[in-house]
Amino acid sequence: MDHYDSQQTNDYMQPEEDWDRDLLLDPAWEKQQRKTFTAWCNSHLRKAGTQIENIEEDFRDGLKLMLLLEVISGERLAKPERGKMRVHKISNVNKALDFIASKGVKLVSIGAEEIVDGNVKMTLGMIWTIILRFAIQDISVEETSAKEGLLLWCQRKTAPYKNVNIQNFHISWKDGLGFCALIHRHRPELIDYGKLRKDDPLTNLNTAFDVAEKYLDIPKMLDAEDIVGTARPDEKAIMTYVSSFYHAFSGAQKAETAANRICKVLAVNQENEQLMEDYEKLASDLLEWIRRTIPWLENRVPENTMHAMQQKLEDFRDYRRLHKPPKVQEKCQLEINFNTLQTKLRLSNRPAFMPSEGRMVSDINNAWGCLEQVEKGYEEWLLNEIRRLERLDHLAEKFRQKASIHEAWTDGKEAMLRQKDYETATLSEIKALLKKHEAFESDLAAHQDRVEQIAAIAQELNELDYYDSPSVNARCQKICDQWDNLGALTQKRREALERTEKLLETIDQLYLEYAKRAAPFNNWMEGAMEDLQDTFIVHTIEEIQGLTTAHEQFKATLPDADKERLAILGIHNEVSKIVQTYHVNMAGTNPYTTITPQEINGKWDHVRQLVPRRDQALTEEHARQQHNERLRKQFGAQANVIGPWIQTKMEEIGRISIEMHGTLEDQLSHLRQYEKSIVNYKPKIDQLEGDHQLIQEALIFDNKHTNYTMEHIRVGWEQLLTTIARTINEVENQILTRDAKGISQEQMNEFRASFNHFDRDHSGTLGPEEFKACLISLGYDIGNDPQGEAEFARIMSIVDPNRLGVVTFQAFIDFMSRETADTDTADQVMASFKILAGDKNYITMDELRRELPPDQAEYCIARMAPYTGPDSVPGALDYMSFSTALYGESDL
């Protein structure tokens, strides 16, 4: 702190002469003090319904000065003088100054006359003295007071805020953050402190002044512009304004403390009243529950059944487990609440709580003791009754269990013993029934002990006077009667089963013999029927003769088969005789086979019917095979002549196409003679087609008399026609090429010789490698380097545009003719158009129509693009691009 700060801190109540000199040194301070002191005075005078406008004028008569002192001190001053004379005014001011002096304040150099005369310095000094005495002197923080106390209070309140460092009452407040921090510390909802900036003091100061005036009832005692524009704000003005914050916030804190004290007292009283109500209700509920429970525990009427007594025990357990524990907790909580309530009343100087009559803790303890005494006796009675009934219930349950097991075992046994299932059973079933019956007899003997135990238990229950003895006796008697009846039925069933077994054993032997002989005979008949009905497929006379021989051998075995059939039927008749004699009720058929006599007779009759049908079918097939053989021979004779003829013609045409005898016209004439002879041969092909149609209708699939099929003949004939036509066309094209390109016969022969030389397989085409070798032989320089490969690829694209991988002789001739003959080019056509155009770079539609035929002129006009050169005229056409397009060098 600088020297000025130290002086101000130690001498805040310094004589007026000192602060008078300070005031004269800085007019800005005087301005700040006038505004601040005026606002401070008005903040108190408004409580009396008045205010001042000019601090040195409005206090001159002493009336408002006395009123100000009465407001801030809360005391009454002497009655003021109401006169308007100077003496009256001085008297009133002196009364005010005397009151100030009575408060222990020394007034040095301040006289009533200066105040009445409107001396600004003296008036401000007097007001500052009043502010120090009534607004600042009583401030006390820890061991400091007055100015030091106010400064310490500001430092404590603003300590948590960034960029706030209060060290004095002048420059520490220039940025306005100190005022904003004081407001935010006590009323954080009024200012968003986080948005404030230290470099914007005007906004900070105005924000604090506006908020303090609007929400804290602290008048605006300072101007933000004066504080910011002054190097050192007036300390007295700042202290006066800050003291208003102190009193505003300290008053609010006192009110809050008083309200908290009242709320605390009321809360304690309300809590005690609630505890009293809770005790009364809890005590009433607990006593009512005890009153209802004791009669239930005193009821000792015994039950006849164990179930009923167990239900009572279960109810008692529920009482112990579910109902009583919460009540024990309630009783304990009741005592705790009572003791807690009494303690709280005693600590808060309230009278002790006295519950309603009959609801004292001792009353509840007495009722609870009665409950537990009755409860103990009830539990002993329950256990004794349960032990008493337990023994009877055990015997009764044992009787019921054994009786139920026995009845479940005997259920259906009488019906089983009475049934006559053996009358329709097979031998194996009879043996199984006997085994089953023996097992039942063993089981019956084992159940004898249980029947005796049931009777003994029933006797004991009667002796113990069981309450339900009549039903036990009736059930026991029924079991004994049923047991005697089961014994008689068991013996009767055994006798019937043994008698039936003997008869069925005899029948079973006959069934077995029948099955052993019927099965192979049935298989023989089924095989015979399959063979007789088998659809045979033969293609030769030898095959049908073999089938006929096998059929005759089969017919020779039929007499012996008929004897076996009669023997098998005799066995079945013997079984029928035994069944009729002894009245055996057969439940099923022969267990060893499913073949019946009716089935044997039916199949035998079917075999006898199929034999003559087979004879007829074999005879008809033999005649058909003889006819087919004649067709084979007829077709073979013709095919063996036509096939070689076609092959010969194909070879002759091939020789003509590659030989170089005579001119091309001679070759063409020779080929046309061949074509005529081939056409004249067509009737023989048609006749062969007719014979082939007959063979197909007869379903003949092979022919040992020839190696030629109709398909071979057709393919050969079509190839022959195609070959002669293609060869004639090739020769005609060669003639056209020769004439158009001016190729001599010698050149044509040379080309043919070279082509034939490299056509190793005589296919009429050259592969890429063969074609390359042919070109080299003709003098073309085609190497294996990249340039040579590119040249050969170009040539191949010309001779094989479809990329088939072969070069025909015609393509070879076309290529060679282009290479050796003079042909039209795009340049020649352009030169011709230039002549028609009069040596211009374009041509007009009129010129085209004048020089060319109409259709060709219109063709050119439709396809020529407009000419766009610098010498163009309306309607000019570009004949140059048209000419290049004709030869594929550009798009048409």
Curated annotation (Swiss-Prot):
Coiled coil: none
Residue ranges of domain Calponin-homology (CH) in the record: 31-135, 144-250
Molecular function, one GO term: structural constituent of postsynapse
Residue numbers spanned by region Actin-binding: 1-247
Family recorded in the similarity comment: Belongs to the alpha-actinin family.
Task performed by this protein: F-actin cross-linking protein which is thought to anchor actin to a variety of intracellular structures. Association with IGSF8 regulates the immune synapse formation and is required for efficient T-cell activation.
Official protein name in the record: Alpha-actinin-1
